Every structure is written in C-alpha cells, then in structure tokens.
Design a protein with these regions (language model features):
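Hydrophobic core segments of alpha-helical transmembrane domains in multi-pass membrane transport
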Residues: 7-19, 47-51, 120, 138-150, ...
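Membrane-core helix-loop-helix motifs of multi-pass transport proteins
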Residues: 96-153, 275-299
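Intrinsically disordered, low-complexity non-transmembrane regions of multi-pass membrane transporters
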Residues: 154-195
C-alpha cells in the first residue's frame, strides 16, 4: 500500500510540474538571474576572504575579545551565510560558548551593507525613507534583541554547570579536526577554500531558485494580500519587489520590507541550516531569533519612525 501511495504521489508531483512548467521556468529564471547578477559578485569574494581568514586563524591563538570583533566585522559586513561560518568556527575552537553563539547568530548572520544599500534602499526604498533611518530601523531592534539574548544567556550560564557544554564543544572540535583538510600544504588549503566557497555559493543559488519557484506557485494558486506577503518572505531577492508592488499604505509597505530585510527570507535560513547543524548549534533557536528580529523591526518602524 505504501508503494502505491509513493507511486501516486510521485506521478502527481511530476504531472503538477508539467502543468505549471511556465511558472517553474519563470521562477527558475528569476532566481538564477538574481543569483548571478547580485549574489555572486557581492558574496563570493567575501566567502573566499572568510575562508582565508578562518584558515589563518586555525593556526594561531585568538582571544575572546578578538573573536567577538571578527564575528561582528564579518557577520555584519560580508553578508550571510558568512556570519554562520565564522561563528561556527569559533564555537568549534571552544573560544565562544554555545549560548553566546546562539545569541549572536541572528544579528551576526545578516545581509551585507552593499546589498542593503544597492538593492533594498536605492532600488526600492529611497523615496520612502532616508538611509540613516533605514540603518536605524534594521539594526537597532536586532541590537536590542542581541543584548537581551546575551543577558539571558549569561544568567542561564551562571545557574547551570558548564561541564556538559564543554564536553559537547570538545566533541564538535574533535569531529571538526578529523574532517578538516591537512593545512600543511598551502596549495591544498587554498584549493579547499575555493571548492568550499563555490559549493556554498552554488547551494545558495539552488535555494534561491527553489523558493522563487515556490513563491510564484503560491501567487498563482492563492490570492489576497496575506498570501502575497507570505510568498514575499520566502526569498528576499524576489520578495522585496513583491512587497514594493503591493497596493497598500507606504508606511506598512516600508515596514514589511524592513522586516523582510532583518529576517532574510526562508531561503536565507536554509542557506545557513547545514552549517549550523554541522556545528551542533540549534537551527530552531536561530530561526526563532530571526523571526523575533523581523517582528521587532516591523513594530519599531511602525511605532517610532
């Protein structure tokens, strides 16, 4: 009986895809064009740079203060998922605790300033809000969330024993060391950095295509502003134009775009998912943090700006 159900389900999916080939092709083209024109030129150089930095840091001792500085610089300036890469790296080296890593992930795995200015502000929000106000609306709520999360994390760590956390981190470190390439040969190291960066940027493109197709299918079969907003939150690149084109008040439209900017879209969440899970951090906590940041950005803009 199960085999029959699998056959019926497979046939239904294939038939559905054939009947909606135009929508799927349009979504695939849309996702690939955005990936090629906006993501690869901006993100790939920073992914390579992050790989070189982590390769260098692997051979030296890094203090906690230095680790925090590097996390904020890379996480806020290089674009996601580079923030996930560097946070997971310091967690595997046991420089930063699990609770602190979870608290920093939502804010320090963010869109790059270039994408924020060129795509979000210049192409869509310039007529509605100044860039200074945009920075305030996007980052201030995330800073507030991070401060609260870190405070709660510190309170929790004082009440509980750290032995379990250290054991978990040590296990992850051993696993990471066993899986890491031999850094003795610089050519092998740089080749691995390039291969890893190309792999990650390709995975990002695939996720962008998948969620662009899902958004197009959702808009095709469902109607209403609620459905349009939900489809926009699937992928930030295609979602911002969707929100921009909605026939709603300028205030709400701007707040939604800022909220999506802080959230990053489901596509961005899944781009970081594998890196988070390999490091034994919680993807659910990360998703919850991103959702809270998005909600805070929306409320902050609606109430104070």
């Amino acid at each position: 009986m199960k085999n029959v159900c699998y056959i019926i389900l497979t046939a239904s999916i294939i038939i559905f895809a054939c009947l909606n080939s135009d929508i799927i092709r349009s979504g695939c083209t849309q996702g690939l064009q955005l990936w090629y024109s906006s993501i690869v030129p901006i993100l790939l150089p920073f992914m390579l740079l992050t790989g070189v930095i982590t390769s260098f840091l692997r051979s030296i001792q890094v203090s906690k203060c230095c680790a925090y500085a590097i996390i904020f610089i890379i996480g806020l300036l290089c674009g996601f998922p580079t923030g996930t890469i560097i946070i997971a790296f310091f967690y595997r080296k046991r420089i930063i605790s699990e609770n602190v890593c979870q608290s920093l992930l939502p804010m320090c795995n963010n869109i790059s300033p270039m994408f924020l200015y060129n795509y979000i502000y210049r192409d869509h929000l310039m007529e509605y809000i100044s860039f200074a106000r945009l920075i305030e609306a996007v980052y201030l709520p995330q800073i507030i969330y991070t401060v609260i999360a870190l405070t709660l994390s510190c309170m929790s760590s004082h009440r509980s024993s750290t032995s379990t956390e250290l054991l978990t981190a040590a296990t992850v470190q051993v696993s990471s060391d066993n899986q890491s390439p031999n850094s003795g040969n610089p050519e092998n190291t740089y080749s691995d950095i390039i291969s890893s960066s190309v792999h990650n940027i390709t995975v990002i493109g695939v996720y962008m295509v998948i969620f662009a197709i899902a958004g197009n299918l959702m808009c095709r079969y469902f109607s209403g502003d609620a459905c349009t907003i939900i489809s926009a939150y699937l992928e930030i690149g295609s979602g911002v134009p969707i929100l921009y084109g909605m026939d709603i008040s300028t205030k709400i439209k701007t707040a939604l775009i800022l909220s999506l900017t802080a959230f990053g879209g489901l596509s961005a969440l899944f781009q970081s998912r594998d890196m988070i899970r390999i490091s034994r951090l919680s993807f659910i906590k990360y998703t919850t943090g991103k959702t809270v940041c998005a909600f805070l950005c929306f409320i902050f803009y609606m109430m104070f700006l």
